[in-house]
Amino acid sequence: MTLSIPPSIQCQTEAACRLITRVTGDTLRAIHLYGSAVAGGLKPNSDIDLLVTICQPLTEAQRATLMQELLALSSPPGASAEKRALEVTVVLYSQLVPWCFPPSREMQFGEWLREDICQGIYEPAQQDWDMVLLITQILETSIPLKGERAERLFTPAPAAQLLKALRYPLDLWQSTADVQGDEYHIVLTLARIWYTLSTGRFTSKDAAADWLLPQLPEDYAATLRAAQREYLGLEQQDWHILLPAVVRFVDFAKAHIPTQFT
């Protein structure tokens, strides 16, 4: 099946590609579109997810230019009828072929960083286990906007490293403060981790929620259902009130998510 860029995001995606190509120049190896745009369908608050693969580290000038100019092309979720939030991850090819564990990413742009970027604060290159999951998803479903198809560039991560990457976020969410402000995203991420470890496959956030809901006690199902409804743009939730329920859901999920692929 030949995938194509959804018409609703084509102009914004092409503008982002032109910017990335101009700034990275001869170091650019590939740009891939992945995520909801090509697998599961765009939802009201879905990002446009781009992976940029380069052959040389970014200079500080390149990093600053990308961060600042991506701000103008991106919009916070739900804030604009014309633009979506961009999530742009930049990685060195040498981190992925051959695999380094954990791999490092050169740069990541996302709307959650907008305030820092506006102040000229840019994250440096850093290790990121999520790169293993990202490449796994791209190998399953993606569109090459520049360069070769994913299966010609990348190789799958070994199962043991994929398992480590899937379970790594579970150690990050230890307290109420760790989940506050990102409640529905964390709840849906846990559903996706649960789905993948149980089935060996990746799926969209709302599909993972649909799969998990019938298996949960009602108290926990209600929290997941609330997160799913906000993600789908059906109902805005008051997460300040729901925070204790979210913490209980996180604790329950961490206790019941498989420790191995089943």
From Swiss-Prot:
<feature type="region of interest" description="Helical domain">
    <location>
        <begin position="158"/>
        <end position="262"/>
    </location>
</feature>
<dbReference type="GO" id="GO:0046872">
    <property type="term" value="F:metal ion binding"/>
</dbReference>
<dbReference type="InterPro" id="IPR002934">
    <property type="entry name" value="Polymerase_NTP_transf_dom"/>
</dbReference>
<keyword id="KW-0067">ATP-binding</keyword>
<feature type="active site" description="Proton acceptor">
    <location>
        <position position="87"/>
    </location>
</feature>
<dbReference type="GO" id="GO:0070566">
    <property type="term" value="F:adenylyltransferase activity"/>
</dbReference>
<keyword id="KW-0547">Nucleotide-binding</keyword>
<feature type="binding site">
    <location>
        <position position="47"/>
    </location>
    <ligand>
        <name>Mg(2+) 1</name>
    </ligand>
</feature>
<feature type="binding site">
    <location>
        <position position="231"/>
    </location>
    <ligand>
        <name>ATP</name>
    </ligand>
</feature>
<dbReference type="GO" id="GO:0009012">
    <property type="term" value="F:aminoglycoside 3''-adenylyltransferase activity"/>
</dbReference>
<feature type="binding site">
    <location>
        <position position="49"/>
    </location>
    <ligand>
        <name>Mg(2+) 1</name>
    </ligand>
</feature>
<keyword id="KW-0808">Transferase</keyword>
<feature type="binding site">
    <location>
        <position position="47"/>
    </location>
    <ligand>
        <name>Mg(2+) 2</name>
    </ligand>
</feature>
<feature type="binding site">
    <location>
        <position position="47"/>
    </location>
    <ligand>
        <name>ATP</name>
    </ligand>
</feature>
<comment type="function">
    <text>Mediates bacterial resistance to the antibiotics streptomycin and spectinomycin, does not confer resistance to kanamycin. Binds ATP first, then antibiotic.</text>
</comment>
<dbReference type="InterPro" id="IPR043519">
    <property type="entry name" value="NT_sf"/>
</dbReference>
<feature type="binding site">
    <location>
        <begin position="173"/>
        <end position="178"/>
    </location>
    <ligand>
        <name>streptomycin</name>
    </ligand>
</feature>
<keyword id="KW-0548">Nucleotidyltransferase</keyword>
<comment type="subunit">
    <text>Monomer.</text>
</comment>
<feature type="binding site">
    <location>
        <position position="87"/>
    </location>
    <ligand>
        <name>Mg(2+) 2</name>
    </ligand>
</feature>
<keyword id="KW-0046">Antibiotic resistance</keyword>
<feature type="region of interest" description="Adenylyltransferase domain">
    <location>
        <begin position="1"/>
        <end position="157"/>
    </location>
</feature>
<dbReference type="Pfam" id="PF01909">
    <property type="entry name" value="NTP_transf_2"/>
</dbReference>
<feature type="binding site">
    <location>
        <position position="130"/>
    </location>
    <ligand>
        <name>ATP</name>
    </ligand>
</feature>
<dbReference type="InterPro" id="IPR025184">
    <property type="entry name" value="AadA_C"/>
</dbReference>
<dbReference type="GO" id="GO:0005524">
    <property type="term" value="F:ATP binding"/>
</dbReference>
<feature type="binding site">
    <location>
        <position position="185"/>
    </location>
    <ligand>
        <name>streptomycin</name>
    </ligand>
</feature>
<feature type="binding site">
    <location>
        <position position="205"/>
    </location>
    <ligand>
        <name>ATP</name>
    </ligand>
</feature>
<dbReference type="InterPro" id="IPR024172">
    <property type="entry name" value="AadA/Aad9"/>
</dbReference>
<dbReference type="GO" id="GO:0046677">
    <property type="term" value="P:response to antibiotic"/>
</dbReference>
<dbReference type="Pfam" id="PF13427">
    <property type="entry name" value="AadA_C"/>
</dbReference>
<feature type="binding site">
    <location>
        <position position="49"/>
    </location>
    <ligand>
        <name>Mg(2+) 2</name>
    </ligand>
</feature>
<keyword id="KW-0460">Magnesium</keyword>
<feature type="binding site">
    <location>
        <position position="36"/>
    </location>
    <ligand>
        <name>ATP</name>
    </ligand>
</feature>
<keyword id="KW-0479">Metal-binding</keyword>
<feature type="binding site">
    <location>
        <position position="46"/>
    </location>
    <ligand>
        <name>ATP</name>
    </ligand>
</feature>
<protein>
    <recommendedName>
        <fullName>Aminoglycoside (3'') (9) adenylyltransferase</fullName>
        <ecNumber>2.7.7.47</ecNumber>
    </recommendedName>
</protein>
